[in-house]
Amino acid sequence: MSAQRLISNRTSQQSASNSDYTWEYEYYEIGPVSFEGLKAHKYSIVIGFWVGLAVFVIFMFFVLTLLTKTGAPHQDNAESSEKRFRMNSFVSDFGRPLEPDKVFSRQGNEESRSLFHCYINEVERLDRAKACHQTTALDSDVQLQEAIRSSGQPEEELNRLMKFDIPNFVNTDQNYFGEDDLLISEPPIVLETKPLSQTSHKDLD
């Protein structure tokens, strides 16, 4: 070590004569590194597993104790409590006057029933009006036949006039008929392809 210090002193003196900068260095002997303390224990994995399992069990124990303190209900207990609550509410509400919500719900049911009966009555009224319309059309056909027979026209003209179904009246009352009911629901009348001039000539002959 004394020789090293002498070398360092000499170098420092020479450098000091050249400039103000001093440069010194020393050598240290590094001994062999031993890894004996860093070696893993033979049962370190087993010890770590059991320690982790113990920590997990303790943690779950605290979690379960907190859940039981908050009072999380079980399903069986919840169903029995709901049944008891329903029975108690029924018994308590049996003697009380009706609440406004229940009254409104019953009024809504009654209104829906009245609307349904009104709809049925309207349908029956429409059916009756259609039946009356058909009977009046038949009566008008019979009256037309009698008038033509009394006038003495031939049977061909009678048959020709019978093809046309002309209603005697049109009811425009909107209370009984809708817009679709005013339309004639009978099939369209297909006229013969013969022109009227030929038929008139045949009648004259």
Swiss-Prot record:
List the Pfam families hit by this protein, alphabetically: MRAP
UniProt keyword Glycoprotein present: yes
The UniProt transmembrane annotation reads: 45-65
Q: How does it sit in the membrane?
A: Single-pass membrane protein
Keyword set, alphabetical order: Cell membrane, Endoplasmic reticulum, Glycoprotein, Membrane, Obesity, Phosphoprotein, Transmembrane, Transmembrane helix
Primary role: Modulator of melanocortin receptor 4 (MC4R), a receptor involved in energy homeostasis. Plays a central role in the control of energy homeostasis and body weight regulation by increasing ligand-sensitivity of MC4R and MC4R-mediated generation of cAMP. May also act as a negative regulator of MC2R: competes with MRAP for binding to MC2R and impairs the binding of corticotropin (ACTH) to MC2R. May also regulate activity of other melanocortin receptors (MC1R, MC3R and MC5R); however, additional evidence is required in vivo.
Family statement drawn from the similarity comment of this UniProt entry = Belongs to the MRAP family.
Quaternary organization: Homodimer and heterodimer. Forms antiparallel homodimers and heterodimers with MRAP. Interacts with MC1R, MC2R, MC3R, MC4R and MC5R.
Disorder this protein is connected to according to its UniProt record: Obesity: A condition characterized by an increase of body weight beyond the limitation of skeletal and physical requirements, as the result of excessive accumulation of body fat.
Name of the molecule in the record: Melanocortin-2 receptor accessory protein 2
Q: Which organism is it from?
A: Homo sapiens
Gene field? MRAP2
